[in-house]
Structure formats: C-alpha cells, structure tokens
Amino acid sequence: MPALLPSLTEINAQLADQAATQIIQWAATEFGSGLVLSTSFGIQSAVMLHLATQVQPDIPVIWIDTGYLPTETYRFAAELTERLKLNLKVYQSEISPARMEALYGRLWESESVEDFNRYDQMRKVEPMNRALQELGATAWLSGVRRQQTAHRQSMEIVELKRDRYAIRPILGWHSRDVYQYLTAHDLPYHPLFDQGYVTVGDWHSSRPLQADDSDERSTRFRGLKQECGLHL
C-alpha cells in the first residue's frame, strides 16, 4: 500500500483548476516509479497516452487484451505504440477465450447482468489487478470523464481505491475538449469512430451510437450496464 497522502479533500481542491498536464506532473513527482497508466486503445485513448508520455515518456502503460477486441483496435494499438514509443505492458486473463466459452458459455449473450459481470471479472478485472500488483503500482492514471456515465459523475480527481490511488487528469473534460486536443496535436482517433462508434470495447458488446441513446455508454453491454468493473 502506498504512503497515505494528506487530506484528499485538500488535494482535490488544489488540483481542480489545474490543467491535465499539471495533474500528471504532480502524480509523477508524488509517486515516481509507482505511477502507471491504463489504456483501452479506445476511441479517445490517444489523448491520455499523449498527455502522460509528454510528462513521463517511459511510464508503464497497461493494456488489458480480453481476446475479443475488434481487429481495428489491435491495429490502432500497434499504431499508437509505435508512434508514441509506449512502454506497453499487455495483460490477459489466465483463462483463454476458448476455455471460458467451453466452461461457461458465451456469457455476453446472456440477459443477466451477473453473467456480464462474471465475464468482466475474468477477462478484465482479474488481469488488471494482477498487472497493478506485478508492476508495483501505487497510483494509476486513467482517462475516465464525468460526462461518460452516472457513476463517473461522482468521481474525484484523486481517490484511494483498493490500496492504490486512482488519478483522473481529464475527469472534467467534455467531448469537445477531447477532439480539440486530438486535432491540436494531430493525433489519430480509433478507426471505428468513422462508423458511428463513440466508445468501443469488445466486439460483441459495442455498437454505434443511435439517436435515442441517453449517453455514449448506452452503446456498451447491450444497455444492461455502463461499467466494466475496472473503475468501480
């Protein structure tokens, strides 16, 4: 467990008006080699990858490969890894996709939230917990934003989660901020954006945005839930 920071209320108040780069710089100074970054290589992932590597070029970047990502995601990951010279750490579930399907079925086809949660625990949460442990992470940068889900609206920039600090430099950004940053720095967005996707995870539980969707995360998990478990 990392050394406890002083009052998180005070820290969040101090960081509230800071730019994302300044928040990352604070985190790099505070946590040093214990700081890691997670990425999904999703629609907007180039933003956090660029921000973080401008401050700390060799920061470990954790990518959880579920084995069910779209072809476009694997190609996008290769492009960004080469372009930004990422110190990429790829983690996967200890149970292969074929073995999981043989033992438990195609869990994503279920109408049960519990089955989706079981899938996410095996393919995402367990590998992430293992990655954080093996890399000796004391703090974890992510690109979540309040605009994305109801759960994320209540998040703070810095929180203590399961004995590690979760740090969210772009928590207050809106979609326009994301795309302005991508444009200003000539960064690519995920290829599926051009097909109407505003968020993308596994191929079987992501779809393009529709006119009647309440928010962008409604396009995930067939609308049964909004969080995969990594940021709960």
UniProtKB/Swiss-Prot annotation:
It is an enzyme of class 1 (oxidoreductase). One of its GO terms (biological process) is hydrogen sulfide biosynthetic process. Belongs to the PAPS reductase family. CysH subfamily. The gene is cysH. Catalyzes the formation of sulfite from phosphoadenosine 5'-phosphosulfate (PAPS) using thioredoxin as an electron donor. GO terms for molecular function: phosphoadenylyl-sulfate reductase (thioredoxin) activity. Gene3D superfamilies: HUPs. This is Phosphoadenosine 5'-phosphosulfate reductase.
